[in-house]
Amino acid sequence: MASGLTAQEEYTFDLSEIEKKPFHFGGYLEFRPVFLDLDRDSLLYNLRFYDLDEGESIAEYNFNALLDFSYDKGIFSAKIRTNTDITKSFSGWSHETTLYEAFLSVKPSLSFHLDFGKKRMKWGKGYAFNPAAFIDRAKNPNDPDLALEGFVVISVDYIKSFKGKLRTITLTPVLLPVYDHINSDFGEWNKLNFGGKVYFLLYDTDIDIMFLSGGSGPARYGIDFSRNMTSNFEIHAELAYIPDYSKKVIDQSGSVIEENYANTSYLLGIRYLTRSNTTFIIEYFKNGSGYTPSEMDDFYFLIEQAYEDYLLTEDDTQLNFLAGGESQAYRTFAPMQDYLYLRISQKEPWDILYFVPSLTSIINLTDGSFSLAPELLYNPVTNLELRAKITVLVGKDRSEFGEKQNDFRLEFRGRYYF
């Protein structure tokens, strides 16, 4: 009898313990101190700190909480992602909570999905740049893996599978409304934009064809592909074409003019993994909306002139204008036209478990300036990630990285996942 009871106890288990729970809560908490060594002779330093004396360096302390809530049961699922930033900088304390994603999904079959709400579309194949990501916010090439805020959309995925060289087709039509309280920063208000993407898995190659139109911005068309040439070597590319693009340019007189032209942007990239677990990511980015050397030189000339006028008259009107929205494209990531991105990372060198050093460089091929960022990533215990990163900026006067507000940036990051 005792033997029988032992056998029954050995093979008894609770089905509820292995069933997938419909609710999930996760995310991470992060602390990220940043130290900047300021370049007090640079033009962008003068533009931002012209009326302040912050010394040779400044410190910034960032606290971040990314929270994910999801529900998945039957044909229905939902996801909410929020991001809270609390920052202590030279200007004081600030905080902001942003709803990154909040959408409902209905999946009545494996071939049909309907999504409604705020979400990221994640179009494009580039790692650091995505010129064909028409319904996504631009990545930060200095940290491409950062979570980003989505847009409110209605999208459908219809998936069809085949036998043969063409394995899969997915049709993804998208509606994107733009009003004063919905996607208000996307473009012109009171417009209902329509876009779409067609995905093909053809000859073991991922191919996307996409478009977006509707009036909030000029119509645009794109294509991308990625293919694993071998198990450790991948190539990818994407192209965006905007036939009626309008670019704001500030000329030497300080007037804002609009240049209209057909804009073509594209990206070519590779990802290669060696036998020793070294990963190389290389991308060339042609930014068709970027500024020419003469246009950037005009902008730098205006800052220099405005700063000299401020020193003589204490009139900062022109400096405030150059630091405002009209010139934002001059001060964003990759403001010019030709860039090379390189990242080299080594997994667990010298048999140090959970340790990944890397080196990243972004090179402006037009003016020769560049950033160089060595980084150390370590996971000492489960769910805890520690990162140390130094970014050094190198460039001559009137070059992109030579005129940044700082010479180098030292950053630590502790992130706990749950």
Task: Give the positions of each predicted feature.
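Extracellular/periplasmic loop regions
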Residues: 44, 234-347, 359-361, 401-403
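Extracellular loop and loop/strand-boundary signature of outer-membrane beta-barrel proteins
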Residues: 50-55, 87-90, 138-142, 181-184, ...
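Outer membrane beta-barrel
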Residues: 63, 68-176, 200, 395
